Amino acid sequence: RQRQMCIRDRYETVEKADHSLPLLIPMSEVAGRMSIQEGARFLEKPQGGKGILLGGVPGVKPAKVLILGGGIVGSNAAQMAAGMGADVTVADINLSRLRYLSETLPKNVKTLYASELRIKKELPDVDLVIGSVLIPGNKAPHLITRKMLAMMQPGTVLVDVAIDQGGCFETSHPTTHSAPTYVIDGIVHYAVANIPGAVPYTSTLALTNATLPYVIALANKGWKKACKDDPALALGLNVVEGKVVYKAVADVFDLKYEPIN
């Protein structure tokens, strides 16, 4: 039997000491901003939405946007939505993060400590929901269930940025740029699995800027020394010579976890 020599370093799990994910940040920034751009488009009546302009006009209130998750995706979505004049709420379970967002985002962005009850209270008059919850290396939690769809008005738009991690809406399944949406119980679902792929020029440059230092380190030092010198890169290791060395990945796929020495 041929020995498996694959060394796999995963972008999503390269993690710095402050728990930031440097190789995921660029695509998260793009996806967060695109989620609002796409959400606004599918709120238009010809696209199956309510026919609401995200920022409203004088005398007509703007759309209400609920963003689930205040990380990089969520904060960029909030910044974009606020800039377009929407009524924005960001929900998260990290109070420190909520304080930071409250201090740094525009004043038309409100923060909310997330719970099932509080999310349910927001749904009846929400127009656009962005799902942006990330658990590194693991599946996203389902924050909106099938039953909760009935609490929203027909034409409400759900954008599931977490679809790459399984989605944070129970009714989500991956879609494509050529067929980005589907409707369940009157609710428009947008769940494109590679949102940044719609803007490849911007996405490629942003990702290259973040990736290049790691590529140079790997090329100059080899993977062992590069990972030894940089703990963030070492955390990105998922598979080494056929062994799964990242616990969350092993758990998700029910594989044996073999920590690297």
Predicted segments — roles?
Residues 2-7:
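Short, small-residue-biased leader/transition segments that mark boundaries at the very start
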Residues 8-9, 88, 158, 189:
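Hydrophobic beta-strand scaffold residues
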Residues 12-53, 163, 168-261:
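Adenosine-phosphate binding glycine-rich loop
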Residues 14-15, 95, 137:
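Conserved beta-strand edge residues that scaffold enzyme active sites
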Residues 26-33, 71, 75, 91, ...:
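Electropositive phosphate-/nucleotide-binding environments in soluble metabolic enzymes
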Residues 46-131, 181:
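Glycine-rich phosphate/diphosphate-binding loop of Rossmann-like nucleotide-binding domains
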